């Protein structure tokens, strides 16, 4: 932490040591999902999360991700959760429904259980766009999960040490 003109600033913290991360991955558009997963887990371990502290579960599609995240959140075992998948535009309105409802579900679970959830569900016009974005987005979700887990832990510590 640093002080700037008498304002306490909480620095970002990308140290994954000691964190437990849950990942829910959609099996729909599996090649893209696995690309996201590979980049995500590589970045998690590079930042210090132990493989034994990463739990992966898979679900049929993006709409099922929030339910699995909710069950992981209920376990109170995880410091942060990650959602991975790809919703690729088709010729029907279904794309918008899946993209919007999966994102809404992630946000609802995060708020209800007070747990950070990194959204790695790609929404693209075609498979080429998804393939082009999967490596960067996979790594980004790992960094978001670690940074937000550490922020929540820091804020919890500050709350506990505050005078009552």
Swiss-Prot record:
It is an enzyme of class 2 (transferase). The keyword Transferase applies. GO terms for biological process: riboflavin biosynthetic process. One of its GO terms (molecular function) is 6,7-dimethyl-8-ribityllumazine synthase activity. 5-amino-6-(D-ribitylamino)uracil binds at residues 28, 62-64, 86-88, 119. Signal peptide: none annotated. The keyword Transferase applies. InterPro entries: LS, LS/RS, LS/RS_sf. GO terms for cellular component: cytosol; riboflavin synthase complex. Pathway: Cofactor biosynthesis; riboflavin biosynthesis; riboflavin from 2-hydroxy-3-oxobutyl phosphate and 5-amino-6-(D-ribitylamino)uracil: step 1/2. Keywords: Riboflavin biosynthesis, Transferase. (2S)-2-hydroxy-3-oxobutyl phosphate binds at residues 91-92, 133. It catalyses: (2S)-2-hydroxy-3-oxobutyl phosphate + 5-amino-6-(D-ribitylamino)uracil = 6,7-dimethyl-8-(1-D-ribityl)lumazine + phosphate + 2 H2O + H(+). Its EC number is 2.5.1.78. The active site is at 94 (proton donor). It comes from the Bacteria. It holds the Pfam family DMRL_synthase. Catalyzes the formation of 6,7-dimethyl-8-ribityllumazine by condensation of 5-amino-6-(D-ribitylamino)uracil with 3,4-dihydroxy-2-butanone 4-phosphate. This is the penultimate step in the biosynthesis of riboflavin. Belongs to the DMRL synthase family. HAMAP family: Lumazine_synth. This is 6,7-dimethyl-8-ribityllumazine synthase. It comes from Nitrosomonas europaea (strain ATCC 19718 / CIP 103999 / KCTC 2705 / NBRC 14298). The gene is ribH.
